[in-house]
Amino acid sequence: MTKTWPPRTVIRKSGGLRGMRTLESALHRGGLGPVAGVDEVGRGACAGPLVVAACVLGPGRIASLAALDDSKKLSEQAREKLFPLICRYAVAYHVVFIPSAEVDRHGVHVANIEGMRRAVAGLAVRPGYVLSDGFRVPGLPMPSLPVIGGDAAAACIAAASVLAKVSRDRVMVALDADHPGYGFAEHKGYSTPAHSRALARLGPCPQHRYSFINVRRVASGSNTAEVADGQPDPRDGTAQTGEGRWSKSSHPATMRATGRAQGT
């Protein structure tokens, strides 16, 4: 009988870090390692960059990351404590920042998929298999699997989610100093009531995404749109859901963070 990959593995989300390693361990046993996890932060924000991280965790270094979990379930303090540990113990990691203008130009989904491809391509160690959080990532030169709720089911995805979240939060704090009055340090660019009030008072800044209807509504001086605040405008071509890729000449000028653990 022909074997297929990945194997049918039971993911026990309540099993702590050991449960999160089940799928990765099965892939390693099948000779498909190293296994990279990839995740993004900032899809739903109406301001600030979309941040994508890829991370490879070594099987022998997991004990140092006992507190690892989905970044959304961790406090800011816990994420900040985990961030340097992940950078230290990861076999490799790479973080890509996609500016708001590029998100507007290509659409959130296309930008997200391209960011995942670029994050994986930027790893110092070539993975044998890639696990992504929920989204299929076409165009990778190695096999991959989208895992629904992956940041709570696979340790490498959880690590990538922490890297992306902390990296983006730090950028938003810095942008708060560059663009005072919007409260970026507090809401991180998401559409909170405080952000909406500041946006109405000050108007959009260069960090806002004009493909989001609440930003466009303020920019145009119109308040008659019936599309929910903080969502991409479905009437706008930039809100497409296709899986297109950018040409080489149109890759966004992004900031990057790359690392490889010492001794690997």
From Swiss-Prot:
UniProt-annotated stretches for the region Disordered: 222-264
InterPro entries in the record: RNase_HII, RNase_HII/HIII, RNase_HII/HIII_dom, RNaseH-like_sf, RNaseH_sf
Swiss-Prot/TrEMBL keywords: Cytoplasm, Endonuclease, Hydrolase, Manganese, Metal-binding, Nuclease
Cofactor binding mode and count: Manganese or magnesium. Binds 1 divalent metal ion per monomer in the absence of substrate. May bind a second metal ion after substrate binding.
Keyword Nuclease part of the UniProt annotation: yes
Catalytic reaction annotation: Endonucleolytic cleavage to 5'-phosphomonoester
Source domain of life: Bacteria
Compartments reported by the entry: Cytoplasm
Residues the record lists as binding a divalent metal cation: D39, E40, D133
Listed GO CC annotations: cytoplasm; ribonuclease H2 complex
Domain RNase H type-2 residues, every copy: 33-224
EC identifiers of the protein: 3.1.26.4
GO molecular function, one term: RNA-DNA hybrid ribonuclease activity
Keyword Manganese appears in the UniProt entry: yes
A biological-process GO annotation: DNA replication, removal of RNA primer
Cofactor: Mn(2+); Mg(2+)
HAMAP family registered for this protein in UniProt: RNase_HII_B
Function as written in the Swiss-Prot or TrEMBL entry: Endonuclease that specifically degrades the RNA of RNA-DNA hybrids.
Family: Belongs to the RNase HII family.
Protein name: Ribonuclease HII
